[in-house]
Amino acid sequence: MPSTIEAIYIILIAGELTIGIWGNGFIVLVNCIDWLKRRDVSLIDIILISLAISRICLLCVISLDGFFILLFPGTYDTNVLESIMDAVWTFANNSSLWFTSCLSIFYLLKIANISHPFFFWLKLKINKVILAILLGSFLISLIISFPINGMWYNLFKVSHEENITWAFKVSTIPGAFKQLTLNLGAMVPFILCLISFFLLLFSLVRHTKQIQLHATGFRDPSTEAHMRAVKAVIIFLLLLILYYPVFLVMTSSTLIPQGKLVLMIGDIVTVIFPSSHSFILIMGNSKLRAAFLKMLRFVKGFLRRRKPFVP
């Protein structure tokens, strides 16, 4: 019988998982329906579909890992199963971060105005550049997650010892080096997002100064687009700053002994990022926002028309 803390954990994780899968599933569903209707798909739709699918996978893996540790603590006594879970988690996490960096780069190339030949070339080739980054992101995540994970497992399967109990989770130094190597790979998309943010901010400041010189007295569409993009990237960075350190602690059992309570809190915090960011993406995209509001109106109308049940 789960304790009170464990019951609260299960309720919170189940709620976050439901919200996250619903939000990301909504993004995939709306874009796929629009794709089938128009027989065409835009670049931003491809990015959002890829990001939402990776987020769904990440949510499922995080939640599954938490339930295993809480309800079936002996599950990871088999190193093979732990290696598989590590690989899938690393792949889902890295691909999610890489696809988000693609979204930040797309905002940058689509909206920012920077007078540099290389930037102009990137803007002209935006479709090819973003598609190349998407494909490269997928391949990099795949290589980092599965072959490297398998290589480390085969290399240290004799010396790598692990003890998972209700009290703590500890591993040896070879496993620590492996996990740090895999986790540091996720820093690259984070750095790309930071670069995109600062370039967008630079472009916004520069554009605002030009508007002030002309003394128009109101914001033009370009300024509004800059502001929306900067706000979207800022929110993403804040969520990522909350998520990434906790993720590092959660996956660094090789260096930091972790109590059951720490693992549960870590799971709850890490699920916030992929769950909440989906709704920020929905409200920041005109097509998704319109579909979401239409759905809300339908639900509201359905509830109004529904007659109360009288026994």
From Swiss-Prot:
A cellular-component GO term for this protein: membrane
Localization: Membrane
Alphabetized UniProt keyword annotations: G-protein coupled receptor, Glycoprotein, Membrane, Receptor, Sensory transduction, Taste, Transducer, Transmembrane, Transmembrane helix
Membrane topology per record: Multi-pass membrane protein
Extracellular compartment segments: 1-9, 73-86, 147-179, 257-260
TM regions (residue ranges): 10-32, 53-72, 87-109, 129-146, 180-202, 234-256, 261-283
Record GO biological process: detection of chemical stimulus involved in sensory perception of bitter taste
Coiled-coil annotated spans: none
Sugar-bearing residue positions: N163
Chief site of localization: membrane
N-terminal signal peptide: none
Side Cytoplasmic, residues: 33-52, 110-128, 203-233, 284-311
GO molecular function per UniProt: bitter taste receptor activity; G protein-coupled receptor activity
PANTHER family assigned to the protein according to its UniProt record, in alphabetical order: TASTE RECEPTOR TYPE 2, TASTE RECEPTOR TYPE 2 MEMBER 9
Misc remark: Several bitter taste receptors are expressed in a single taste receptor cell.
Free-text function comment from the UniProt entry: Gustducin-coupled receptor implicated in the perception of bitter compounds in the oral cavity and the gastrointestinal tract. Signals through PLCB2 and the calcium-regulated cation channel TRPM5.
Family indicated by similarity: Belongs to the G-protein coupled receptor T2R family.
Protein name in UniProt: Taste receptor type 2 member 9
